[in-house]
Design a protein with these regions (language model features):
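Extreme N-terminal starter segment of soluble prokaryotic enzymes
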Residues: 3-9
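N-terminal FAD cofactor-binding segment of flavoenzymes
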Residues: 29, 47-94
């Protein structure tokens, strides 16, 4: 088990968790960060699944793209673009009705603004954010394949316990970046 040397534990390494780690590093925060992810790597529900039988078949699920609209561009956008992690979305957005008919995009605001996708799959957004966090001063660690089963508040922070009941780590601060524990 990791000791109290971990300042911040982030449960979930999707765009929210990796984005938080990258934003903290961009702001100059030097505390030790550990991200815990149940999946094989970063991405969470913004990922691309590939067929084992057909390597050309790839399906984005969850968040197939993201948009930036209104206000100034987020500071993390340019390093993600220039690092090759994301690219403009070149396609068109359509809707599919209950009859299976293709129609125009629904006017819900989600397809407005500048649209981006991960280059090579949506998990590249999270991989890029994680790379930005790891390339900055301060320790940033990703623990993949790590199920957090229980959160125990302590006098000076938190103890996180795994599926087998054994403590995973202790930390000063804790962020839950998704609905993760609701599934178990």
């Amino acid at each position: 088990m990791g000791g109290r040397g971990i300042d911040l534990a982030i449960v979930g390494a999707g765009p929210a968790g990796c984005g938080l780690a990258a934003a903290l590093r961009l702001q100059g925060w030097g505390g030790a960060i550990t991200l815990l992810e149940i999946g094989r790597g970063p991405g969470g529900r913004a990922a691309t699944r590939r067929s084992r039988q057909d390597p050309t078949l790839a399906i984005n699920h969850g968040a197939p793209l993201f948009n930036i609209r209104g206000g100034p561009e987020p500071a993390l956008l340019e390093p993600l673009r220039s690092g090759g992690w994301i690219e403009p979305f070149p396609g068109a957005i359509h809707s599919l009705d209950g009859e299976g008919q293709l129609g125009p995009a629904i006017d819900d605001g989600f397809s407005d603004g500048s649209l981006y996708q991960g280059r090579g799959g949506m998990e590249q957004l999270s991989r890029g954010l994680l790379a930005l966090a790891q390339g900055s001063p301060g320790a940033t660690e990703l623990r993949s394949g790590c199920l957090v089963r229980h959160l125990q508040p302590e006098a000076e922070g938190w103890t996180l316990t795994g599926a087998d009941g054994a403590p995973l780590l202790q930390c000063r601060w804790l962020v839950l970046s998704g609905t993760l524990l609701a599934h178990h």
